[in-house]
From Swiss-Prot:
Belongs to the bacterial ribosomal protein bS21 family. This is Small ribosomal subunit protein bS21B. The keyword 4Fe-4S does not apply. Keywords: Ribonucleoprotein, Ribosomal protein. GO terms for cellular component: ribonucleoprotein complex; ribosome. It comes from Francisella tularensis subsp. holarctica (strain LVS). PROSITE patterns: RIBOSOMAL_S21 (PS01181). HAMAP family: Ribosomal_bS21. One of its GO terms (molecular function) is structural constituent of ribosome. InterPro entries: Ribosomal_bS21 (IPR001911), Ribosomal_bS21_CS (IPR018278), Ribosomal_bS21_sf (IPR038380). It comes from the Bacteria.
Length: 65
């Protein structure tokens, strides 16, 4: 869990912005969005397979140049 120490005389908005940024870097927001709805195991496998195919195509394109 990201934590932010509030500096002396620091406005709340600035501290909140730093906290949000640290949460983004930790991947909390994307993890929440991913877990928002139940994903069937078949859908998860299909999503992972298509991502692997995209990565393979992308790496082939970069290598061919």
């Amino acid at each position: 869990m990201p934590s932010v120490r509030i500096k002396e005389r620091e406005p709340f908005d600035v501290a909140l912005r730093r906290f949000k940024r640290s949460c983004e870097k930790a991947g909390i927001v994307s993890e929440l969005r991913r877990r928002e709805y139940f994903e069937k195991p078949t859908w998860a496998r299909k999503r992972k397979k298509t991502a692997a195919v995209k990565r393979a195509h992308k790496s082939n394109i970069i290598v061919k140049r």
